[in-house]
A protein has these predicted regions:
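Repeated scaffold domains used in trafficking and secretory/extracellular systems
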Residues: 41-47, 86-92, 128-135, 173-181, ...
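Surface loop/turn motifs at the tips and blade-to-blade linkers of beta-strand repeat domains
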Residues: 35-39, 78-84, 122-126, 165-173, ...
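Short loop/turn segments that connect beta-strands within beta-propeller blades
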Residues: 68-71, 113-116, 155-158, 201-203, ...
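Conserved beta-strand positions in repeat-built beta-propeller and related beta-rich domains
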Residues: 49, 56-60, 101-106, 143-149, ...
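Blade-level signature of beta-propeller repeat domains, shared across WD40, Kelch, NHL, RCC1
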Residues: 252-280
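Short coil/turn segments that connect the beta-strands within blades of beta-propeller domains
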Residues: 51-52, 96-97, 138-139, 185-187, ...
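Beta-strand-rich domains and repeat architectures in extracellular enzymes and scaffolds
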Residues: 35-62
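A short helix->beta-strand "capping" segment at the edge of beta-propeller domains
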Residues: 21-42
């Protein structure tokens, strides 16, 4: 991606310090390449790629874009723009051997290499019509299906037919699930539409439920062994310690947030900003 030197210099001066406990600093600012606007691509979710790249997913236009130093600008999907297309892509993730795309309507996982070349695909049986997914650092994928109100485990290109977590067993877990995430230890976090966060072990054992105390939480973000919630206005809070964070205004409006180690990547309308998080 191209970077604006003047923007970067000014953004490095922006620091958010809250309660002398956590520090957010803007480490990088990456404006979208011009091809994004030329092709009228509007990514609404994204994921860290490899070698400093990012994967941008436009769920409306069914388009996946890779931007960064590894491949420059590359795209796959869309309506008639490429040899291969998606029906309803709802999630993109990076595995040790490539990129995974979860297609809800087709009930399948599509595998691409890091240059977005098609490799293979796996059909999901039973037909989950998946809504959300998350992947851990070992390549285990966890898929939420509202049809079953359950989380399924997908490993080594095989879907376990028995739910990893049957949410129907928990009366305190709402049927409306907003986010599903996995942390560095493989533990699962669920953000419900009612602002409650539910935590499970990597084996699917229930740990605890915690009420979020920020208005309209939209994003659930694991950073190391801590869990945070953020809303679209950039207000954030660690759900256990209740320490607040504020995303700098330059990163607003927020369309998606993803973490890697101690860094946050913020997807906005025309750029990605990267924040370093210092935990004291």
């Amino acid at each position: 991606m191209r970077r604006s030197p003047n923007y970067i210099i000014s953004l490095f001066a922006v620091i958010c310090i809250v309660r002398s406990q956590h520090v957010l600093t803007i480490a990088d600012y990456q404006p979208f390449p011009s091809e994004i606007s030329i092709l009228n691509i509007n990514p609404d979710s994204f994921e860290w790629g490899v070698a400093g790249s990012f994967l941008l997913l436009d769920k409306i236009d069914n388009q996946l874009v890779s931007v960064g130093n590894l491949n420059g600008f590359q795209t796959v999907g869309g309506f008639g723009r490429n040899n291969f297309s998606f029906s309803e892509p709802i999630w993109v993730g990076v595995e040790p051997n490539g990129i995974s795309i979860l297609d809800r309507l087709e009930n399948k996982i599509v595998y691409l290499d890091y240059r977005l070349n098609y490799m293979s695909e796996v059909n999901l049986e039973p037909r989950l019509y998946p809504d959300l997914a998350a992947i851990d650092k070992w390549g285990n994928m966890f898929i939420y299906s509202s049809q079953f109100h359950s989380i399924f485990h997908f490993e080594k290109r095989h879907l376990r037919k028995t739910p990893h977590i049957d949410l129907n067993r928990f009366s305190n877990i709402d049927f409306c699930i907003r986010r599903l995430m996995v942390n560095q230890d493989g533990e699962l976090g669920i953000l419900g539409c009612n602002s409650y966060v539910h935590l499970f072990s990597k084996h699917g054992e229930f740990k605890r439920t915690i009420k979020s105390h920020i208005d309209s939480p939209e994003f659930l973000v694991p950073i190391r062994d801590k869990w945070y919630v953020f809303n679209k206005e950039g207000n954030g809070q660690s759900i256990i310690e209740k320490i607040t964070l504020q995303i700098p205004a330059v990163s607003l409006p927020i369309k998606d947030i993803k973490s890697m180690n101690r860094s946050l990547a913020i997807l906005s309308n025309d750029h990605i900003s990267i924040l370093n998080v210092k935990l004291k």
